[in-house]
UniProtKB/Swiss-Prot annotation:
This is Tryptophan synthase beta chain 2. The gene is trpB2. It holds the Pfam family PALP. InterPro entries: Trp_synth_b-like, Trp_synth_b_CS, Trp_synth_beta, Trp_synth_beta/beta-like, TrpB-like_PALP, TrpB-like_PALP_sf. The lineage of its organism: Archaea, Thermoproteota, Thermoprotei, Sulfolobales, Sulfolobaceae. The beta subunit is responsible for the synthesis of L-tryptophan from indole and L-serine. It catalyses: (1S,2R)-1-C-(indol-3-yl)glycerol 3-phosphate + L-serine = D-glyceraldehyde 3-phosphate + L-tryptophan + H2O. It comes from Saccharolobus solfataricus (strain ATCC 35092 / DSM 1617 / JCM 11322 / P2). The keyword Lyase applies.
Length: 429
């Protein structure tokens, strides 16, 4: 009998709750700071009221609204876990590799998991429209689809570099009915100020956040947060909750849980439901490894301090690993990894040594993406590729120890709309 490669969870077994890590953190999360006295009031105006309430929730588990659960099923949940057998063989059969395939959702990434919740709660507030930022376009396309499914209008502010480098995601958002604007944007006062200084400003996620918040505030919309904050991570934990059930189905318990970090929600969404069990037990056995871009090394070279999550400094300061809210990253193709900070909950766990952080260059990660594509037949997103080098390191560690290890990977998205970016780096086209 052939080895089981794909682990599916029946639709009627989809988890009915999100997981909230706040009650299980090793210490209380440092609260937001508001030096101006205006940022928290702004948040109350631009965030959906239920999202703001859930940001500070004390409950360990939060019921997923039926309307959101129904749409999870509609967009491809539960997603499968796939065993990367040929990659295992290439690495010497020292590790077993299981991929949580968030790329199987209709938008091709993990982002739809929280987009549906945010837009649903904005609709409950009778918002005129929603706004958000996007880098490579995965988050923007997810908000665009979520808005379509809840019959809402969406304005997406896309980092200018990606707006022109990744036109197909822009078209995807437009197909879902969203309006897409390059950021810095001439629709906002902050954007116009930046464009006056540099009409070809490449933009950044921090700037796009500022554009989206300002536009929502001045025009009666609600701002949809794409990462970093606890509520967004909570909404995305549907992936980790599914993965726990799937690993139990095959009698496997991961020794390592790995994934990439832009703002932190992708990795946290998979890892937190597993990590929460260990934090409550008082002993963390597994190794949790988060990877990022060496071109934007916030986890390895950043400082753990209070900083603004957006460039215009409109939002409250958060304690996180950061390389500075004014940082304008190089135009690397993994647009989702270009954010300057790391989610406060994940930052706390990194600072305590519970989660390890590693960075890899674009060139190294893209070479692994090509190898992975040849071996497994599936092309990862540029962001996702930054998790692949970890596997070789784990395989080498397992070889030295003589113990075969099991690795669970967040396969956060596919790269079928990023082939031009791969070609520029790998084939010099």
């Amino acid at each position: 009998m052939a080895m089981r490669i794909r682990i599916d969870l029946p639709q009627d077994e989809i988890p009915a709750q999100w997981y909230n890590i706040l009650p299980d953190l090793p210490e209380e999360l440092p609260p937001p700071q508001d030096p101006t006295g205006k940022s928290l009031e702004l948040l109350k105006e631009v965030l959906p009221s239920k999202v703001l309430e859930l940001e500070f929730a004390k409950e360990r588990y939060v019921k997923i609204p039926d309307e959101v659960l129904e749409r999870y099923l509609q967009v491809g949940r539960p997603t499968p876990i796939i065993r990367a057998k040929r990659l295992e063989e290439y690495l010497g059969n020292n590790i077993k590799i299981y991929l949580k395939m968030e790329s199987y959702t209709y938008t091709g990434s993990h982002k739809i998991n929280s987009a549906l919740a945010h837009v649903y709660y904005a609709k409950l507030d009778n918002a005129k429209f929603v706004t958000t930022e996007t880098g490579a376009g995965q988050w923007g396309s997810s908000v665009a689809l979520a808005s379509a499914l809840f019959r809402m209008k969406a304005h997406i502010f896309m980092v200018r570099t990606s707006y022109y480098a990744k036109p197909y995601r822009k078209y995807m958002m437009q197909m879902y009915g969203a309006e897409v604007h390059p950021s810095p944007s001439d629709l906002t006062e902050f954007g116009r100020q930046l464009l006056a200084k540099d009409s070809n400003h490449p933009g950044s996620l921090g700037i796009a956040i500022s554009d989206a918040v300002e536009y929502a505030h001045k025009n009666g919309g609600k701002y949809v947060v794409g990462s970093v904050v606890n509520s967004d991570i909570m909404f995305k934990t549907i992936a980790g909750m599914e993965a726990k059930k799937q690993m139990e189905l095959i009698g496997e318990d991961p020794d390592y849980i790995i994934g990439v970090v832009g703002g932190g929600s992708n990795y946290a969404a998979l890892a937190y439901p597993f990590l929460g069990d260990e934090l409550r037990s008082g002993k963390v056995r597994r190794k949790y490894i988060a990877s990022g871009s060496s071109e934007v090394p916030k986890m390895t070279k950043g400082v753990y301090k209070y900083d603004y999550p957006d460039t215009a400094k409109l939002l409250p300061m958060l304690k996180m690993y950061t390389i500075g809210s004014d940082f304008v990253p190089p135009p690397v193709y993994a647009g989702g990894l270009r954010y300057h900070g790391v989610a406060p909950t994940l930052s706390l766990l990194i600072s305590k040594g519970i989660v390890q952080a590693r960075d890899y260059s674009q060139e190294e990660s893209f070479k692994w993406a090509k190898l992975f594509s040849e071996l497994e037949g599936y092309i990862p997103a540029p962001e996702t590729s930054h998790a692949l080098p970890i596997l070789a390191e784990i395989a080498e560690e397992a070889k030295k120890s003589g113990e075969r290890k099991t690795v669970l990977v967040s396969f956060s998205g596919h790269g079928l709309l990023d082939l031009g970016n791969y070609a520029s780096v790998l084939f010099k086209e």
